[in-house]
Amino acid sequence: MRIDLHTHSTASDGTDTPAELVRNAAAAGLDVVALTDHDTVGGYEAAKRALPAGLTLVTGAELSCRLVLPPSGGGGSGASEDGAAGVSLHMLAYLFDPAEPELARERELVRDDRVPRARGMVDKLRELGVPITWEQVARIAGDGAVGRPHVATAMVDLGVVESVSDAFTPQWLANGGRAYVEKHELDPFDAIRLVKAAGGVTVFAHPLALKRGQCVPESAIAELAAAGLDGIEVDHMDHDEPTRARLRGLAADLGLLTTGSSDYHGSRKTCRLGEYTTDPEIYGEIARRATGACPGAGPGGGARGPGGAGAHTAPGEVGRGGREV
């Protein structure tokens, strides 16, 4: 069974529509795919309507978070009064109730901040001599949630950088980079609490992706685990083999699940659907822990999880509070 738990559509910063994404997932030989657009579940219904036979769709989102660290660099769950530094991170949330009001409100706050943030990055790039315009970025984003990848794509189109990845450097858009602009982000401890309250499961995405900027220290990951974090994403394109081995050891020490995922964005990045996958036993445990929503199977039913512990449902099954998921 092939399982990819980290993908993006045009509902955020991918290039595949939700319908195209699930069709491409089936064509890639996947049995299970999670749609984890940034801070939104807006693409889920369209993906569900287009779900091919034999493919299971997992409700998900990639939540934008910021961990405040004390000046010493240790972990911590709250801001210090003397201006502690913060580290941006992404929290994958699975099988939560999308209608849970507090979590929905936080996702909306993050989304509302995306346009002014992207405009700020455009302004900084123009100050650096890049002939980029807001109209160009908005056109690239279309109906999606505008973000750094759209700005990066504009930079590629202008010939400023060769690839989207090349824009995510300290010279340009990486965390703390010359054209970087902060945005509203959840405290990760709050994110864990809110997702759990909505019946979901949390996995820390690409925790040691050094090319993206400063990473969260392992001491802070231990604190997140103590606060209820379920797992960490280990097999990811931004982790080399030594990093993956290090993360597997950390997960074993902390009792965390380990996942693997493509972080697929369509043509915007080079990664392919199913390039990295999650072990079926791990996926089964994620499904068993979740109470907020159930994976949805395409016509003919989806793949069965280990032991069949209620991990998959027929289309139209209702989740928490009677809401169809």
Name each region found by the language model.
Residues 234-305, 316-325:
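C-terminal appended segment following the main domain
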Residues 1-87, 172-174, 186, 192-193, ...:
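An N-terminally biased module of ancient metal coordination in phosphate/nucleic-acid-related enzymes
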